[in-house]
Amino acid sequence: MKLLHVDSSILGTYSVSRQLSAEIVAEWRKSRPDTTVEYLDLALNAPNHFGADAIAIKGIAQPEPTEAQRAENALSEQLVSQFLASDVIVIGAPFYNFSIPTQLKAWIDRLAQPGRTFTYNEKGPLGLATGKTVIVASTRGGAYSTSEGGQAMEHQESYLKVVFGFFGITDVRIVRAEGLAMGDAPKAAALSAARADMELATA
């Protein structure tokens, strides 16, 4: 079994999402010691934002791609191949400005490739990356899951569920710690709740 461990927080050792994603991987391996782990730190090795050079080879017919276009295409192929070769993907995904870190979005944009992770048929979109499990370490400074107003502002977990569902992945598990910036007691409660989620997510 192959596990891809992805972190995206820019906070380094201060990051709770990094702490939780590492704990998830460790818990997963306790009962599956044969799991091989590959690590991707998007804060240290962020792909370029998806631009014209990245899509040129696949989306625009031209006689000879430029060196920049070849380089961007090679990076996209490397990332999507790594993703498709993984059985389990553990993602540290903090809540930044109501959504996910830009580095994580840039990675997902490289994965969203027609013919690799999705296609279309007469009924609409069809995900091609089936049979995988995604576990998200979701961290938030405030509390957004407990009210309609908060849920309306949340485009982090909801986005990840939609995009991985679009890729054909129906097993998306959330390990959530929210309210981390609301004081010591709420933070302790959030971490306790996250570890309870973790026990279920790694079972």
Swiss-Prot record:
**Matches recorded under SUPFAM superfamilies:** Flavoproteins
Q: What cofactors are annotated for this protein?
A: FMN
Record note on cofactor: Binds 1 FMN per subunit.
Which Gene3D superfamilies does UniProt cross-reference here? 3.40.50.360
Is the keyword Oxidoreductase assigned to this protein?
A: yes
Q: Which UniProt keywords apply?
A: Flavoprotein, FMN, NAD, Oxidoreductase
E.C. numbers: 1.6.5.-, 1.7.1.17
Q: Name one GO molecular function term.
A: FMN binding
Family annotation (Pfam families): Flavodoxin_2 (PF02525)
The residue ranges crossing the membrane are none
Question: For binding FMN, which residues are annotated in this chain's numbering?
Answer: S9, S15, V16, S17, T139, R140, G141, G142
Per its record, the protein catalyses:
2 a quinone + NADH + H(+) = 2 a 1,4-benzosemiquinone + NAD(+); N,N-dimethyl-1,4-phenylenediamine + anthranilate + 2 NAD(+) = 2-(4-dimethylaminophenyl)diazenylbenzoate + 2 NADH + 2 H(+)
The protein's assembly and partners: Homodimer.
* Record-stated family: Belongs to the azoreductase type 1 family.
* Protein's UniProt name: FMN-dependent NADH:quinone oxidoreductase
Task: Specify the species.
Answer: Albidiferax ferrireducens (strain ATCC BAA-621 / DSM 15236 / T118)
Q: What is the lineage of its organism?
A: Bacteria, Pseudomonadati, Pseudomonadota, Betaproteobacteria, Burkholderiales
Gene that specifies this protein: azoR
